[in-house]
């Protein structure tokens, strides 16, 4: 998979931010992990969820990945404009993660699996890289 099905328009970026903002209390009221955690955000897109979850965990480190460099650039800009400094954005494919097994304390993904050709395989690949548990919202 190498393209986001809804495209990369400004309209879509605004829709994603509106969606994240309107559901943040419902989805992320408990998205708080232990200080010092290393968290993988798989399929971060434009950073719509990142801007909500990373500030709640300012003493943890996020590695937020996506396959789209354009989306990652937007995510970096959103993080910078919100003074979010605990996130490293990286181009990576969920099916070919460049990290050691059990590297992450937690993994979270939101609105990602429905875009995968094989979501079970995606979860299996992610499972190799986690020590604790992961959260996903689809």
Label for each model-derived stretch:
Residues 18-37, 52:
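Conserved alpha-helix/loop element of class I SAM-dependent methyltransferases that forms part
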């Amino acid at each position: 998979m190498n393209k986001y099905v809804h495209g990369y328009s400004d309209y879509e970026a605004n829709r994603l931010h509106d969606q994240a903002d309107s559901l943040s209390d419902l989805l992320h009221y408990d998205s708080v992990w232990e200080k010092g955690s290393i968290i993988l955000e798989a399929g971060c897109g434009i950073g719509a969820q990142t801007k909500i979850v990373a500030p709640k965990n300012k003493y943890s480190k996020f590695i937020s990945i996506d396959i789209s460099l354009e989306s990652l650039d937007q995510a970096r800009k959103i993080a910078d404009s919100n003074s979010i400094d605990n996130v490293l954005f990286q181009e990576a494919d969920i099916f070919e993660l460049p990290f050691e097994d059990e590297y992450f304390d937690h993994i979270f993904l939101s609105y990602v699996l429905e875009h995968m050709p094989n979501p079970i395989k995606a979860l299996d690949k992610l499972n190799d890289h986690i020590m604790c548990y992961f959260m996903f919202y689809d």
